[in-house]
């Protein structure tokens, strides 16, 4: 059984990005990412801090907008507009979730698709579906890299994605399809979830329920990717998969922490470089 090491693989990607950034800088091309955070949600603050640290490591400038909780929709839209128009900014990231009084969809739609390094804009999603160049959502793209760099063959394999969110489940299915996997998407209305999961050569779980998937959902020799992240009753991080029960049955599995998590930020850095290469002045 192989433990897929997301820390190691994400570091490889960041080192590759760092080299690309140095090369672009040598050609006089700087890269900058605008990070917009509204309010001081503790989890969001940790993510923002990690993104800034990654930017610093690879040589991308990060421009921070830390806005108070009571920021209005108009004020937020004005900052997005300012970043859209600033030729020095290559990527715009709005840290989600936003406070309840703000319209997330309107804000994400307002981001210039050429700067949509999160890959959430409908234009980016459309490009992903038809296989055009553009930004891929960071977490699902990170999962594909984990599989490929761990020597897991996707082509022709039975792939099951548990969860159909716009951020992970749906794009995950699309990216596995692009790699010629035979993909099934499961959700709360799926009948016989256990039986469907047991068909999977590659099982990707993003269901948002701690330790939901145990060994009865997994066939011998499957590859299991756990996208979930929760804090359990002992104040320890755990995923959607009951790791201790499932791991012995698998041929490869991602742990939580140290699996999918670190990949998301590494792929964000990769998207910032893509932005400069595809659309930079």
Language model: regions and residue ranges:
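Short beta-strand elements in bilobed, periplasmic/extracellular small-molecule ligand-binding domains
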Residues: 33, 55-69, 183-185
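Glycine-rich phosphate/diphosphate-binding loop of Rossmann-like nucleotide-binding domains
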Residues: 40-52, 134-223, 227, 236-247
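Positively charged, low-complexity intrinsically disordered leader regions
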Residues: 1-29
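Anion-binding alpha/beta catalytic cores of soluble intermediary-metabolism enzymes, centered on
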Residues: 93-154
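Short beta->alpha junction loops
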Residues: 39, 63-73, 188-190
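Short beta-strand segments enriched in small/hydrophobic residues
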Residues: 31-39
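Rossmann-fold NAD(P)-binding glycine/threonine-rich loop
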Residues: 104-121, 125, 228-280
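Short, well-structured alpha-helical segments in soluble
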Residues: 75-87
């Amino acid at each position: 059984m192989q433990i897929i090491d997301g820390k190691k693989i994400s570091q490889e990607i960041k080192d590759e990005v760092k080299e690309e950034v140095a090369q672009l800088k040598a050609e006089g091309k700087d890269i900058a990412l605008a990070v917009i955070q509204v309010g001081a949600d503790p989890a969001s603050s940790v993510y923002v801090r990690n993104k800034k640290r990654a930017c610093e490591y690879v040589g991308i400038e990060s421009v921070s907008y830390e806005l108070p909780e009571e920021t209005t929709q108009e004020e937020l839209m004005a900052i997005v507009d300012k970043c859209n128009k600033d030729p020095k900014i290559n990527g715009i990231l709005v840290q989600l979730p936003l406070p309840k009084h703000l319209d997330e969809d309107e804000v994400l739609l307002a981001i210039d698709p050429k700067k949509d390094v999160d890959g959430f804009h409908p234009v980016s999603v459309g490009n992903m579906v038809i296989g055009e160049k553009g930004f891929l959502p960071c977490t699902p793209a990170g999962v594909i890299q984990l599989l490929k760099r761990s020597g897991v063959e996707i082509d022709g394999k039975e792939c099951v994605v548990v969860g159909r969110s716009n951020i992970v489940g749906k794009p995950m299915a699309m990216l596995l399809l692009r790699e010629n996997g035979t993909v099934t998407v499961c959700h709360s209305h799926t009948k016989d979830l256990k039986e469907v999961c047991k068909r999977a050569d590659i099982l990707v779980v993003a269901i948002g329920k701690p330790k939901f998937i145990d060994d009865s959902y997994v066939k011998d020799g499957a590859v299991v990717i756990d996208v979930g992240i929760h804090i359990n009753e002992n104040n320890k991080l755990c995923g959607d998969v009951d790791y201790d029960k499932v791991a012995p049955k698998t041929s490869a599995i991602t742990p939580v922490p140290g699996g999918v998590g670190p990949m998301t930020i590494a792929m964000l850095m990769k998207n910032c470089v893509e932005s400069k290469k595809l659309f930079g002045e």
